[in-house]
Amino acid sequence: GWTQIEQCPFGKETPAKAISDGYHLWQERGAVEAQNNLTDIGRALAKLPIDPRVSRMILAARDMGALREVLIIAAALSVQDVRDRPQEARQQADAAHVKFADPQSEFLSYLNIWRWFEDAVAHKKSNRQLQELCRANFLNHLRLREWRDVHSQLRTQVLEQGWRENEIEPTYEQLHCALLTGLLGNVGFKNEAKPLPNATAQ
């Protein structure tokens, strides 16, 4: 068998940069060591056949007591934004979305939308009424359904690994520390003297 990805017979020539970027992504998340061998984190991530950014935040959430919420957010990040903002009705859409916004974090807005939709599904009288309710709130019904489907798939995968969802709501710090493990490349620094664009800047 092959021991290195460079030895794998891909269908067409794979640019060396693509392989290098892949290694960097995994190194950044603690999944491989300097010699590109899998770490314990890497072996755990390999059991979740999803984007390593998403699987890394889910793994951290398991250890930080925020798995239930991070599964919801991770699924949201895996689909197109469920909020509709048509050009001809942007002000109305923004006004409708205010109820879901959280002043502290965009991630918490996802949880607000999720809870709203779960409540709407639980109390719906018909699919048509549910679709109309979503439309009135400038939410895309089909993408909301896709979000639920992805969440169900992610949840099934982690439960099959023997992981357990938290019963106690996590703190702001627990939730966001877990999420940031998968989003390191998007973390910004504020340096008045010499601002850096992101956490991976040289």
Give the positions of each predicted feature:
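Second RecA-like catalytic domain
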Residues: 1-202
